[in-house]
Amino acid sequence: MKILVMNCGSSSLKYQLLDMDNGKVLAKGLAERIGINDSLLTHQVEGKDKIKIQKDMKNHKEAIQIVLEALVDKEIGILKDMKEIDAVGHRVVHGGEFFTDSVLIDDEVIKKLEACIDLAPLHNPANIEGIKACRQIMPGVPMVAVFDTAFHQTMPDYAYIYPIPYEYYEKYRIRRYGFHGTSHKYVSLRAAEILKRPIEELKIITCHLGNGSSIAAVKGGKSIDTSMGFTPLEGLAMGTRSGNVDPSIITFLMEKEGLTAEQVIDILNKKSGVYGISGISNDFRDIENAAFKEGHKRAMLALKVFAYRVKKTIGSYTAAMGGVDVIVFTAGVGENGPEMREFILEDLEFLGFKLDKEKNKVRGKEEIISTEDSKVKVMVIPTNEEYMIAKDTEKLVKGLK
Protein backbone atom coordinates (compact mmCIF):
# COMPACT_ATOMS: atom_id res chain seq x y z
CA MET A 1 0.00 0.00 0.00
CA LYS A 2 1.37 3.43 -1.00
CA ILE A 3 0.46 6.28 1.32
CA LEU A 4 1.04 10.01 0.85
CA VAL A 5 1.58 11.84 4.15
CA MET A 6 0.87 15.58 4.19
CA ASN A 7 1.62 18.28 6.72
CA CYS A 8 0.18 21.65 5.69
CA GLY A 9 1.47 24.76 7.44
CA SER A 10 0.16 28.28 6.87
CA SER A 11 2.48 28.86 3.88
CA SER A 12 4.14 25.46 3.51
CA LEU A 13 3.44 21.83 2.67
CA LYS A 14 5.69 18.96 3.75
CA TYR A 15 5.07 15.56 2.20
CA GLN A 16 6.35 11.99 2.11
CA LEU A 17 5.28 9.10 -0.07
CA LEU A 18 5.73 5.79 1.76
CA ASP A 19 5.49 2.19 0.58
CA MET A 20 3.94 0.44 3.58
CA ASP A 21 4.83 -3.03 2.28
CA ASN A 22 8.42 -2.36 3.34
CA GLY A 23 8.11 0.93 5.29
CA LYS A 24 10.38 2.73 2.79
CA VAL A 25 10.17 6.42 1.88
CA LEU A 26 9.79 6.62 -1.92
CA ALA A 27 9.85 10.41 -2.19
CA LYS A 28 9.65 13.47 0.01
CA GLY A 29 9.64 17.20 -0.29
CA LEU A 30 8.62 20.65 0.82
CA ALA A 31 6.59 23.36 -0.88
CA GLU A 32 7.41 26.76 0.60
CA ARG A 33 6.07 30.31 0.37
CA ILE A 34 2.57 29.18 -0.68
CA GLY A 35 0.42 32.27 -1.29
CA ILE A 36 3.54 34.48 -1.23
CA ASN A 37 5.82 35.37 -4.15
CA ASP A 38 8.79 33.12 -5.08
CA SER A 39 7.02 29.86 -4.20
CA LEU A 40 9.43 26.92 -4.26
CA LEU A 41 9.11 23.14 -4.32
CA THR A 42 12.05 21.03 -3.14
CA HIS A 43 11.39 17.45 -4.27
CA GLN A 44 13.50 14.33 -3.77
CA VAL A 45 13.02 10.76 -4.91
CA GLU A 46 14.80 8.30 -2.59
CA GLY A 47 18.37 7.68 -3.75
CA LYS A 48 18.39 10.65 -6.13
CA ASP A 49 19.42 14.30 -5.86
CA LYS A 50 17.10 17.01 -4.58
CA ILE A 51 15.32 18.99 -7.29
CA LYS A 52 14.15 22.58 -6.84
CA ILE A 53 11.14 23.79 -8.84
CA GLN A 54 10.13 27.45 -8.83
CA LYS A 55 6.46 27.73 -9.67
CA ASP A 56 3.67 30.02 -8.58
CA MET A 57 1.48 28.46 -5.85
CA LYS A 58 -1.39 30.78 -4.94
CA ASN A 59 -2.88 28.37 -2.40
CA HIS A 60 -2.58 24.84 -0.96
CA LYS A 61 -4.66 23.38 -3.79
CA GLU A 62 -2.13 24.58 -6.39
CA ALA A 63 0.75 23.35 -4.22
CA ILE A 64 -0.79 19.86 -3.90
CA GLN A 65 -1.38 19.78 -7.66
CA ILE A 66 2.31 20.59 -8.27
CA VAL A 67 3.44 17.94 -5.74
CA LEU A 68 1.29 15.28 -7.45
CA GLU A 69 2.61 16.31 -10.88
CA ALA A 70 6.18 15.92 -9.57
CA LEU A 71 5.39 12.45 -8.18
CA VAL A 72 4.14 11.17 -11.58
CA ASP A 73 6.62 13.11 -13.76
CA LYS A 74 8.57 10.85 -16.16
CA GLU A 75 11.93 12.36 -15.24
CA ILE A 76 11.69 13.41 -11.60
CA GLY A 77 8.81 11.23 -10.39
CA ILE A 78 8.46 7.78 -8.87
CA LEU A 79 4.88 6.81 -9.85
CA LYS A 80 3.42 5.95 -13.26
CA ASP A 81 -0.04 7.13 -12.28
CA MET A 82 -1.68 9.07 -9.45
CA LYS A 83 -4.00 6.07 -8.98
CA GLU A 84 -1.05 4.25 -7.34
CA ILE A 85 -1.62 6.38 -4.22
CA ASP A 86 -3.90 4.23 -2.05
CA ALA A 87 -4.56 6.78 0.71
CA VAL A 88 -3.53 10.15 2.14
CA GLY A 89 -2.67 10.74 5.80
CA HIS A 90 -3.00 14.34 7.02
CA ARG A 91 -1.31 15.75 10.10
CA VAL A 92 -3.82 17.86 12.04
CA VAL A 93 -2.55 19.87 15.00
CA HIS A 94 -5.71 20.08 17.14
CA GLY A 95 -8.57 17.61 17.45
CA GLY A 96 -10.01 19.13 20.63
CA GLU A 97 -12.07 16.66 22.67
CA PHE A 98 -13.72 15.27 19.54
CA PHE A 99 -10.93 12.91 18.53
CA THR A 100 -9.21 10.38 20.76
CA ASP A 101 -7.62 8.62 17.80
CA SER A 102 -6.89 8.96 14.10
CA VAL A 103 -10.02 9.01 11.94
CA LEU A 104 -11.20 8.52 8.35
CA ILE A 105 -12.15 11.93 6.96
CA ASP A 106 -15.72 12.68 5.88
CA ASP A 107 -17.87 15.85 5.87
CA GLU A 108 -18.75 15.36 9.54
CA VAL A 109 -15.07 15.18 10.54
CA ILE A 110 -14.33 18.40 8.62
CA LYS A 111 -17.16 20.17 10.51
CA LYS A 112 -15.61 19.09 13.81
CA LEU A 113 -12.16 20.25 12.66
CA GLU A 114 -13.63 23.65 11.84
CA ALA A 115 -15.14 23.76 15.34
CA CYS A 116 -11.56 23.40 16.71
CA ILE A 117 -10.16 26.42 14.81
CA ASP A 118 -10.49 28.59 17.93
CA LEU A 119 -8.15 26.21 19.76
CA ALA A 120 -5.43 26.29 17.05
CA PRO A 121 -5.96 29.43 14.96
CA LEU A 122 -2.42 29.29 13.50
CA HIS A 123 -2.43 25.65 12.43
CA ASN A 124 -5.89 24.14 11.94
CA PRO A 125 -7.04 26.43 9.07
CA ALA A 126 -4.06 25.33 6.92
CA ASN A 127 -4.58 21.67 7.88
CA ILE A 128 -8.25 21.91 6.83
CA GLU A 129 -7.42 23.73 3.59
CA GLY A 130 -5.00 20.93 2.67
CA ILE A 131 -7.62 18.26 3.38
CA LYS A 132 -10.31 20.01 1.31
CA ALA A 133 -7.92 20.55 -1.61
CA CYS A 134 -6.86 16.90 -1.55
CA ARG A 135 -10.46 15.71 -1.56
CA GLN A 136 -11.15 17.83 -4.66
CA ILE A 137 -8.03 16.74 -6.54
CA MET A 138 -8.18 13.06 -5.50
CA PRO A 139 -11.87 12.17 -5.19
CA GLY A 140 -12.49 8.63 -3.99
CA VAL A 141 -9.03 8.26 -2.39
CA PRO A 142 -9.45 7.53 1.36
CA MET A 143 -8.09 10.27 3.62
CA VAL A 144 -7.18 10.01 7.29
CA ALA A 145 -6.63 12.75 9.89
CA VAL A 146 -3.94 12.09 12.51
CA PHE A 147 -3.95 14.51 15.44
CA ASP A 148 -1.11 15.95 17.54
CA THR A 149 -3.53 16.05 20.48
CA ALA A 150 -5.23 12.62 20.21
CA PHE A 151 -2.59 10.54 22.03
CA HIS A 152 -3.02 12.72 25.15
CA GLN A 153 -6.81 12.31 25.26
CA THR A 154 -6.25 9.44 27.72
CA MET A 155 -5.11 11.93 30.41
CA PRO A 156 -7.32 11.70 33.52
CA ASP A 157 -9.47 14.75 34.30
CA TYR A 158 -7.35 15.73 37.32
CA ALA A 159 -4.34 16.00 34.96
CA TYR A 160 -6.07 18.10 32.29
CA ILE A 161 -8.38 20.44 34.24
CA TYR A 162 -6.96 23.87 35.13
CA PRO A 163 -7.70 25.17 38.63
CA ILE A 164 -9.79 28.09 37.28
CA PRO A 165 -13.63 28.44 37.48
CA TYR A 166 -15.05 25.20 36.02
CA GLU A 167 -17.58 27.12 33.92
CA TYR A 168 -14.75 28.19 31.56
CA TYR A 169 -14.09 24.55 30.78
CA GLU A 170 -17.81 23.98 30.16
CA LYS A 171 -18.18 27.12 28.03
CA TYR A 172 -14.93 27.24 26.08
CA ARG A 173 -13.33 23.83 26.65
CA ILE A 174 -10.33 25.49 28.30
CA ARG A 175 -8.23 22.55 29.53
CA ARG A 176 -4.85 20.95 28.94
CA TYR A 177 -4.61 19.14 25.59
CA GLY A 178 -0.92 18.48 24.97
CA PHE A 179 0.85 18.26 21.61
CA HIS A 180 3.57 16.25 19.78
CA GLY A 181 1.29 13.26 20.41
CA THR A 182 2.28 11.43 17.22
CA SER A 183 5.95 11.65 18.22
CA HIS A 184 5.36 10.56 21.84
CA LYS A 185 3.25 7.64 20.59
CA TYR A 186 5.84 6.53 18.03
CA VAL A 187 8.87 6.59 20.35
CA SER A 188 7.05 4.92 23.25
CA LEU A 189 5.92 2.05 20.98
CA ARG A 190 9.41 1.81 19.48
CA ALA A 191 11.03 1.73 22.96
CA ALA A 192 8.86 -1.26 23.94
CA GLU A 193 9.77 -2.98 20.63
CA ILE A 194 13.51 -2.44 21.13
CA LEU A 195 13.34 -3.76 24.71
CA LYS A 196 11.11 -6.66 23.58
CA ARG A 197 8.68 -5.94 26.40
CA PRO A 198 4.90 -5.43 26.22
CA ILE A 199 4.16 -1.69 26.39
CA GLU A 200 1.25 -2.48 28.73
CA GLU A 201 3.71 -3.21 31.55
CA LEU A 202 6.04 -0.23 31.02
CA LYS A 203 6.24 3.24 32.57
CA ILE A 204 7.92 5.43 29.95
CA ILE A 205 8.91 9.11 30.01
CA THR A 206 9.29 10.46 26.47
CA CYS A 207 11.27 13.70 26.02
CA HIS A 208 10.59 15.38 22.66
CA LEU A 209 13.22 18.13 22.79
CA GLY A 210 13.63 20.51 19.88
CA ASN A 211 12.74 24.10 19.05
CA GLY A 212 9.33 23.10 20.45
CA SER A 213 9.72 20.74 23.42
CA SER A 214 7.39 18.56 25.45
CA ILE A 215 7.56 15.57 27.76
CA ALA A 216 4.93 12.86 28.24
CA ALA A 217 4.31 10.29 30.96
CA VAL A 218 3.24 7.09 29.17
CA LYS A 219 1.91 4.40 31.48
CA GLY A 220 0.89 1.07 29.95
CA GLY A 221 0.98 2.64 26.47
CA LYS A 222 -1.34 5.51 27.41
CA SER A 223 -0.42 9.16 27.95
CA ILE A 224 -1.38 10.11 31.52
CA ASP A 225 0.25 13.55 31.51
CA THR A 226 2.22 15.87 29.26
CA SER A 227 3.97 19.21 29.68
CA MET A 228 2.21 21.30 27.00
CA GLY A 229 -1.30 22.47 27.83
CA PHE A 230 -4.15 24.46 26.27
CA THR A 231 -1.59 25.65 23.71
CA PRO A 232 2.02 24.65 22.92
CA LEU A 233 3.19 27.61 25.05
CA GLU A 234 2.86 25.77 28.37
CA GLY A 235 5.57 23.60 29.90
CA LEU A 236 9.31 23.54 29.29
CA ALA A 237 11.50 26.44 28.19
CA MET A 238 11.89 26.03 24.41
CA GLY A 239 13.67 27.61 21.43
CA THR A 240 11.65 30.83 21.46
CA ARG A 241 8.75 29.92 23.80
CA SER A 242 8.83 30.71 27.50
CA GLY A 243 6.99 27.64 28.77
CA ASN A 244 5.51 28.04 32.27
CA VAL A 245 5.55 31.58 33.65
CA ASP A 246 3.46 33.31 36.32
CA PRO A 247 0.38 34.63 34.41
CA SER A 248 0.65 37.95 36.31
CA ILE A 249 3.78 38.71 34.27
CA ILE A 250 1.46 39.37 31.30
CA THR A 251 -0.47 42.23 32.93
CA PHE A 252 2.72 43.52 34.59
CA LEU A 253 4.48 43.83 31.20
CA MET A 254 1.38 45.35 29.59
CA GLU A 255 1.43 48.09 32.20
CA LYS A 256 5.20 48.72 32.33
CA GLU A 257 5.92 48.47 28.59
CA GLY A 258 2.60 49.81 27.25
CA LEU A 259 1.91 46.57 25.35
CA THR A 260 -1.32 44.81 24.41
CA ALA A 261 -2.07 41.27 25.66
CA GLU A 262 -1.49 40.02 22.12
CA GLN A 263 1.95 41.65 22.00
CA VAL A 264 3.00 40.06 25.31
CA ILE A 265 1.82 36.60 24.16
CA ASP A 266 3.79 37.18 20.96
CA ILE A 267 6.91 37.89 23.06
CA LEU A 268 6.32 34.72 25.10
CA ASN A 269 5.87 32.69 21.89
CA LYS A 270 8.54 34.16 19.63
CA LYS A 271 11.15 36.04 21.65
CA SER A 272 11.51 34.02 24.84
CA GLY A 273 12.87 30.58 25.77
CA VAL A 274 16.60 29.96 25.27
CA TYR A 275 16.61 32.71 22.62
CA GLY A 276 15.23 35.23 25.11
CA ILE A 277 17.68 34.31 27.87
CA SER A 278 20.81 33.98 25.70
CA GLY A 279 20.07 36.85 23.33
CA ILE A 280 21.95 34.83 20.69
CA SER A 281 19.76 32.33 18.87
CA ASN A 282 16.96 29.79 19.19
CA ASP A 283 19.30 27.15 17.74
CA PHE A 284 20.75 25.02 20.52
CA ARG A 285 23.92 24.39 18.49
CA ASP A 286 24.70 28.12 18.41
CA ILE A 287 23.98 28.45 22.12
CA GLU A 288 26.12 25.42 23.06
CA ASN A 289 28.93 26.82 20.94
CA ALA A 290 28.76 30.18 22.68
CA ALA A 291 28.48 28.60 26.14
CA PHE A 292 31.19 25.94 25.88
CA LYS A 293 33.67 27.47 23.42
CA GLU A 294 33.30 31.20 24.11
CA GLY A 295 32.33 31.13 27.79
CA HIS A 296 29.18 33.19 27.08
CA LYS A 297 27.45 33.48 30.48
CA ARG A 298 23.89 34.03 29.29
CA ALA A 299 24.19 31.19 26.78
CA MET A 300 25.25 28.90 29.64
CA LEU A 301 22.36 30.18 31.76
CA ALA A 302 19.89 29.44 28.93
CA LEU A 303 21.14 25.84 28.72
CA LYS A 304 20.92 25.44 32.51
CA VAL A 305 17.34 26.76 32.63
CA PHE A 306 16.33 24.42 29.79
CA ALA A 307 17.99 21.35 31.34
CA TYR A 308 16.68 22.13 34.83
CA ARG A 309 13.07 22.29 33.66
CA VAL A 310 13.41 19.01 31.75
CA LYS A 311 15.00 17.37 34.82
CA LYS A 312 12.19 18.61 37.12
CA THR A 313 9.53 17.30 34.74
CA ILE A 314 11.18 13.86 34.52
CA GLY A 315 11.14 13.78 38.34
CA SER A 316 7.51 14.82 38.64
CA TYR A 317 6.36 12.29 36.01
CA THR A 318 8.25 9.53 37.80
CA ALA A 319 6.20 10.45 40.87
CA ALA A 320 2.94 10.62 38.85
CA MET A 321 3.48 7.08 37.49
CA GLY A 322 4.84 5.63 40.73
CA GLY A 323 8.18 4.88 39.09
CA VAL A 324 9.81 4.76 35.67
CA ASP A 325 11.23 1.95 33.50
CA VAL A 326 12.37 3.87 30.43
CA ILE A 327 13.41 7.46 29.62
CA VAL A 328 13.46 8.28 25.89
CA PHE A 329 15.10 11.26 24.17
CA THR A 330 13.86 12.29 20.72
CA ALA A 331 13.56 15.24 18.26
CA GLY A 332 16.35 17.65 17.22
CA VAL A 333 18.04 18.28 20.57
CA GLY A 334 17.04 14.96 22.14
CA GLU A 335 18.48 12.95 19.24
CA ASN A 336 21.56 15.03 18.46
CA GLY A 337 22.62 16.63 21.75
CA PRO A 338 24.89 14.34 23.82
CA GLU A 339 26.01 17.27 26.02
CA MET A 340 22.43 18.36 26.69
CA ARG A 341 21.36 14.78 27.52
CA GLU A 342 24.22 14.50 30.00
CA PHE A 343 23.32 17.90 31.47
CA ILE A 344 19.70 16.77 31.97
CA LEU A 345 20.52 13.34 33.40
CA GLU A 346 23.06 14.65 35.91
CA ASP A 347 21.81 13.96 39.48
CA LEU A 348 18.97 11.75 38.18
CA GLU A 349 20.90 8.49 38.54
CA PHE A 350 19.07 7.83 41.85
CA LEU A 351 16.14 6.78 39.62
CA GLY A 352 18.02 3.58 38.79
CA PHE A 353 20.33 4.09 35.80
CA LYS A 354 23.95 4.89 35.00
CA LEU A 355 24.79 6.87 31.88
CA ASP A 356 27.24 5.14 29.52
CA LYS A 357 29.28 8.15 28.38
CA GLU A 358 30.64 6.35 25.33
CA LYS A 359 27.20 5.27 24.10
CA ASN A 360 25.81 8.73 24.86
CA LYS A 361 28.00 10.15 22.06
CA VAL A 362 25.39 8.84 19.60
CA ARG A 363 23.63 11.34 17.30
CA GLY A 364 20.46 10.64 15.33
CA LYS A 365 20.51 6.85 15.78
CA GLU A 366 18.63 4.39 18.00
CA GLU A 367 20.74 3.51 21.03
CA ILE A 368 20.39 2.48 24.68
CA ILE A 369 22.67 5.00 26.41
CA SER A 370 22.41 3.62 29.96
CA THR A 371 24.81 0.91 31.15
CA GLU A 372 23.76 -2.72 30.74
CA ASP A 373 23.24 -3.22 34.48
CA SER A 374 20.89 -0.20 34.75
CA LYS A 375 17.43 -1.07 36.05
CA VAL A 376 15.97 1.96 34.27
CA LYS A 377 16.81 2.15 30.55
CA VAL A 378 17.70 5.48 28.93
CA MET A 379 17.34 5.54 25.15
CA VAL A 380 17.77 7.75 22.11
CA ILE A 381 15.11 7.08 19.46
CA PRO A 382 14.83 9.33 16.37
CA THR A 383 11.19 10.28 15.95
CA ASN A 384 9.32 9.39 12.78
CA GLU A 385 5.98 11.17 12.80
CA GLU A 386 5.40 10.60 9.07
CA TYR A 387 5.75 6.83 9.48
CA MET A 388 3.33 6.89 12.45
CA ILE A 389 0.80 8.90 10.38
CA ALA A 390 1.18 6.43 7.49
CA LYS A 391 0.80 3.46 9.88
CA ASP A 392 -2.45 4.85 11.34
CA THR A 393 -3.70 5.62 7.82
CA GLU A 394 -2.91 2.10 6.63
CA LYS A 395 -4.72 0.56 9.62
CA LEU A 396 -7.91 2.58 9.06
CA VAL A 397 -7.94 2.09 5.28
CA LYS A 398 -7.40 -1.67 5.62
CA GLY A 399 -10.44 -1.69 7.92
CA LEU A 400 -12.54 -0.37 5.00
CA LYS A 401 -11.81 -3.40 2.84
Swiss-Prot record:
One of its GO terms (cellular component) is cytoplasm. The record marks H180, R241 as: Transition state stabilizer. GO terms for molecular function: acetate kinase activity; ATP binding; magnesium ion binding. It comes from Thermoanaerobacter pseudethanolicus (strain ATCC 33223 / 39E). Mg(2+). Can also accept Mn(2+). Its main location: cytoplasm. Keywords: ATP-binding, Cytoplasm, Kinase, Magnesium, Metal-binding, Nucleotide-binding, Transferase. InterPro entries: Ac/propionate_kinase, Aliphatic_acid_kin_short-chain, Aliphatic_acid_kinase_CS, ATPase_NBD. Belongs to the acetokinase family. GO terms for biological process: acetate metabolic process; acetyl-CoA biosynthetic process. This is Acetate kinase. Substrate binds at R91. It is found in: Cytoplasm. Pathway: Metabolic intermediate biosynthesis; acetyl-CoA biosynthesis; acetyl-CoA from acetate: step 1/2. The active site is at D148 (proton donor/acceptor). It catalyses: acetate + ATP = acetyl phosphate + ADP. Homodimer. Pfam families: Acetate_kinase. ATP binds at K14, H208, L209, G210, N211, G212, D283, F284, R285, G332, V333, G334, E335, N336. Its cofactor is Mg(2+); Mn(2+). The keyword Metal-binding applies. CDD domains: ASKHA_NBD_AcK_PK (cd24010).
